[in-house]
Amino acid sequence: MDKKSARIRRAARARHMMREQGVTRLVVHRTPRHIYAQVIAPNGSEVLAAASTVEKEISAQVKYTGNKDAAAVVGKLVAERALAKGVKDVAFDRSGFKYHGRVQSLADAAREAGLQF
């Protein structure tokens, strides 16, 4: 089993538990250059809020989009957009990535902005 398939397997296991519980998820995906965050409805078919470093609004604020500072900006923005839609409680779906570095920075910023998970 290679590194990518192991990550996908971890993510599937966590998503299965979240789907059974029927909770709104804050999903994070990262690449070496960008980080993406989405708030997904409990049924899994609707994206309630989203933010990523690909957006001009965010890339204009940060010097480099693949670091913890950029992840914190994305976390804050996705939390603000989710709160505007009335979503306050979410489950954190880290997509099999370690809770460390950019993923942790995004989660901390989202918590500070008002999301609870």
Curated annotation (Swiss-Prot):
InterPro entries: Ribosomal_uL18_bac-type, Ribosomal_uL18_bac/euk. One of its GO terms (cellular component) is cytosolic large ribosomal subunit. SUPFAM superfamilies: Translational machinery components. GO terms for molecular function: 5S rRNA binding; structural constituent of ribosome. Pfam families: Ribosomal_L18p. CDD domains: Ribosomal_L18_L5e. One of its GO terms (biological process) is translation. Keywords: Ribonucleoprotein, Ribosomal protein, RNA-binding, rRNA-binding. Gene3D superfamilies: 3.30.420.100. PANTHER family: 39S RIBOSOMAL PROTEIN L18, MITOCHONDRIAL, LARGE RIBOSOMAL SUBUNIT PROTEIN UL18M. HAMAP family: Ribosomal_uL18_B (MF_01337_B). Part of the 50S ribosomal subunit; part of the 5S rRNA/L5/L18/L25 subcomplex. Contacts the 5S and 23S rRNAs. Belongs to the universal ribosomal protein uL18 family. This is one of the proteins that bind and probably mediate the attachment of the 5S RNA into the large ribosomal subunit, where it forms part of the central protuberance. This is Large ribosomal subunit protein uL18.
